[in-house]
Every structure is written in structure tokens, then in C-alpha cells.
Amino acid sequence: GSEMCIRDSNDNKVLYDFFATGEYDRNRDFILTTSPSMDILISSNLERLIYRIAGNDAAKNQELMSELKSQGRYGITDEMKKQLADFYGNYATEEENAATIKKLYEDTGYIIDTHTGVAATVYEKYKKDTGDTTKTVIASTASPYKFTRSVLTAIDPKYDSMGDFELVDELNRLSGVDIPKAIEDIRTAPVLHDTVCEVNEMCDNVKRILGIN
């Protein structure tokens, strides 16, 4: 059978909508989720795919990217959309992601991070939608230790009352996976920056920290 590329999104599902409709529209609310690396309105990688499905037409590619910049949206032709037939797209809500993390832990004892949770959720949707049971490897892109609170509260809400390093120790106990040295070292590392500022003060604060007038 043909190979499929499974494309997953979180609640910021601009890419899901693009693959479903052929229209890319960033004019929407930006949602903060527990999988922040996927919190996007503009996909930096999609431009390369657009170039390919436009027949390596740099001028067409530039036209669409200019539309995105000026209008916040663009649409591809039916001919271009046909070339996306090997892509399956879906998305995972915050609730679905948390449920996947919890179920996988309860079924296997393995704890995944929130981005892998999105992938695993969408993979299950893919299997349900297509009936394809091909053996599939999901490559985790991050350690659950980077997202201890989100991961553990998905397993049990009681963990939300614990401190950050208590959560690190609890994740170690539940998973049996060693605490990464970089995180272990934070326990005793001196706090270098403790400035809290408003968004409109960020530029001035960065300049001050760097000694730039």
C-alpha cells in the first residue's frame, strides 16, 4: 500500500484546516496549550511543501507567501490540493491529549510528553478513520521532564498542588526514567534573572540586561 504522512495539530489547528480545505488562514485566535512547540499561526515548514506542490514554481510560492503576509491568508489550486492526497491531517484537543497521556500510562506504565500526546491521539484517530493497522513508530520529540506539571496532572489532577521539583521527583518515581542532569542541576543553580515585566516593557528590559542604550 501507499505510505501516508500523518500531520497532527493541537487546538491551534491552522494546518489541519489547510489540509482539509486548501486554504491557509492565520486570522484566528492564538490558543496557549500544554504543547507549546505546536502553538503556531504561521507554519515555517509549510512553505517548502507549497513550493513542491506548485511544481517547484518559485514565483507562485512567492505570490502565496506575499498574500499570507499582506492578508493573513491564501488558497491553493485544486491541482495543488490533489498532491496532498498522501497526507492525513487531524488534531488533538487539550482534553484528548490529556486522556491519551493518562491511558498510555495506565495501559503500559510509559509516560509521554505533551507533544507526543498530540501525535499519539491523532494516530489513534487515523487508525479509526482509515482502518490502517500498519505497524507505526511515533518518535517522541521531547522529554516529559520538560512538561512535568502538564503530564502528571493529565494522569491525576492531584499533582497540580505539588511544587515543581516535587513533580520532577514524582515523575522519576512513576516512570523509572532518570532525571536529566540539566534539570537536576537547576535545583541548586543560582537564579540569574528575576525580572518580571509587562509585554510593552520587554524591549527596554532586554536592552538593559544586555547593556545596550
Give a label for each model feature.
Residues 1-6:
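Short, small-residue-biased leader/transition segments that mark boundaries at the very start
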Residues 7-10, 139:
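Generic beta-sheet signal
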Residues 11-16, 144-147:
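Short gly/pro/ser/thr-enriched loop/turn and capping motifs at secondary-structure boundaries
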Residues 16-48, 158-164, 173-188, 192:
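A structural-propensity feature for long, helix-poor, extended segments
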Residues 29-61, 188-213:
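C-terminal domain-closing interface element
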Residues 39-49, 109-119, 139-146:
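Conserved phosphate/anionic-ligand binding catalytic regions in large, soluble enzymes, centered on
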Residues 52-130, 187-199:
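Active-site-adjacent helical/loop segments in soluble small-molecule enzymes
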Residues 117-213:
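C-terminal non-catalytic interaction/assembly regions of soluble proteins
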